[in-house]
């Protein structure tokens, strides 16, 4: 049969076609035996595999305590440590030996300044544990939201993150992207199920989804036009939550890229960028704004004595956001 066409609203292929899943009931890696008859036992095996790898040198623990001494609450301390992680490490994929399953030692990540998702998440956990802040290492899939609850297998995960559990507050941390704000649950894991790796207490949990009312894409623009159809437009694009995540790259683009982007979105092929700036507000909710002024020689269409003024400059941009509706 012919391959199905890509459609934003279709369910994942694995959910609609027949599949056969195979997995060993008993396995052994690096001398550690595991059982795949339950997610709890998978978590127990991962806990044993990671045993002793979340230790830091005494001098590093003392440095952490000195760094966070000024912050009165565990949340503020955790945020300061997350900033430290962002500023002193970088993501490098390491899959040698059993590196695809077991993270590097936290002390090695501290010394080298890099690691993969497992290593960076484990390192972050190690730093928080050194400050007596409760946290857990977790594995998750960035491709599938749901795990097979009656078929436990490590192959269902491809990523590692971590969870901070405070009284009345649960914080999920992505440790591989230094641009993401503290506690931001990005689109690759939002609403996905994860395995909390905590020995006998290992279990499946689901990460929260952003609230619909906080996901906004807003355009504001003020236009001045002349009798010959030329127009100046001051435009403000505001994005929050998933839209914020998708549009953060706007802060890195050049004037020429900005001009090309605006021409594509508005359909104004002759638009020229007069000025532009990118602004972020991460204090209360994750919001970014892109503010610019354009000049378009053919802003309005003319026909004899009539002038046709576009009332929605961004109508051509709607289809790009179907996955976020």
Regions found by a protein language model. Name each.
Residues 1-325:
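A sensor for short, sequence-defined functional sites
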């Amino acid at each position: 049969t012919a391959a199905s066409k890509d459609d934003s609203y279709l369910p994942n292929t694995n959910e609609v076609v027949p599949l056969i899943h195979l997995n060993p009931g008993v396995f052994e890696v690096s001398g550690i035996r595991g059982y795949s008859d339950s997610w709890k036992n998978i978590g127990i095996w991962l806990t044993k595999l990671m045993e002793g790898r979340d230790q830091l040198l005494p001098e590093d623990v003392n440095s952490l305590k000195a760094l966070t001494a000024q912050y009165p609450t565990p949340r503020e301390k955790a945020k300061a440590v997350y900033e430290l992680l962002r500023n002193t490490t970088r993501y490098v994929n390491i899959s040698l030996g059993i590196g695809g399953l077991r993270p590097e030692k936290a002390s090695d990540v501290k010394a080298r300044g890099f690691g993969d998702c497992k290593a960076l998440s484990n390192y972050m956990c190690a730093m928080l544990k050194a400050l007596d802040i409760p946290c857990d290492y977790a594995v998750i899939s960035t491709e599938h939201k749901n795990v097979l609850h009656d078929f436990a297998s490590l192959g269902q995960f491809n990523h590692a993150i971590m969870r901070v559990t405070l009284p009345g507050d649960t914080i999920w941390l992505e440790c591989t992207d230094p641009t993401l704000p503290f506690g931001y649950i990005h689109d690759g894991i939002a609403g996905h199920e994860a395995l909390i790796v905590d020995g006998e207490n290992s279990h499946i949990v689901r990460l929260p989804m952003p609230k619909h009312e906080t996901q906004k894409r807003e355009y504001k623009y003020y236009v001045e036009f002349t009798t010959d159809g030329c127009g100046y437009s001051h435009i403000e694009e505001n994005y929050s939550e998933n839209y914020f995540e998708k549009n953060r790259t706007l802060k890195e683009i050049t004037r020429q890229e900005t001009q090309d982007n605006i021409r594509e979105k508005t359909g104004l092929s002759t638009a020229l960028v007069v000025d532009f700036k990118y602004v972020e507000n991460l204090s209360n909710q994750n919001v970014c704004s892109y503010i610019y002024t354009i000049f378009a020689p053919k802003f309005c269409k003319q026909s004899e004595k009539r002038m046709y003024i576009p009332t929605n400059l961004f109508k051509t941009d709607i289809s790009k956001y179907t996955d976020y509706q």
